[in-house]
């Protein structure tokens, strides 16, 4: 690859985390989120129906995690520095525990990988971030693995 972007200093950043951020989950926020995405599932907006379900009460839609931002670690990419063009390379989600009203969810993102490849427009860098969503009991509720493409 002629135009190498990643250098040793760039690669040393892998594993760094942004500051954790904690959110208090409110019943009204769950209802408004479900309404905004057009999801009428009673688990998300009807306490009585949800109480009768195997969940035993209201829960948040799995995608509710997207409403909880997380500071990402600053990433400096060799020759690109912090100014570059980029694309969203997609996300993979795993869900483990439902999120409930009253939960305190701590969100933290870490730089999981930096990888360089050659594209039609020249060298590209794939940045992989992993975000965890953990409740007040230390239980992992969800993980997100997202990829950004910089060139």
Region annotations inferred by a language model:
Residues 88-94, 148:
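A beta-strand/beta-hairpin structural motif
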Residues 2-90:
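Hot-dog-fold acyl-thioester-processing enzymes
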Residues 1-11, 97-151:
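HotDog/MaoC-like acyl-thioester-processing domains
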């Amino acid at each position: 690859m002629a135009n190498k972007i990643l250098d040793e200093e760039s690669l040393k950043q892998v594993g760094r985390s942004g500051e954790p951020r904690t959110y208090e989950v409110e019943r009204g926020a769950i209802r408004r989120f479900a309404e905004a995405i057009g999801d009428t599932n009673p688990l998300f907006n009807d306490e009585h129906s949800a109480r009768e379900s195997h969940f035993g009460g209201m829960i948040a839609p799995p995608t509710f995690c997207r409403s909880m931002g997380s500071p990402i670690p600053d990433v400096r990419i060799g020759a690109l520095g912090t100014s570059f063009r980029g694309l969203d390379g997609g996300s993979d989600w795993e869900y483990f525990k439902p999120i409930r009203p009253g939960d305190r969810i701590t969100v933290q993102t870490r730089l999981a990988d930096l990888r360089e490849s050659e594209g039609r427009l020249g060298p590209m860098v794939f940045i992989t971030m992993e975000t965890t969503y953990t409740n007040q009991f230390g239980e992992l509720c969800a993980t997100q693995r997202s990829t950004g493409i910089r060139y």
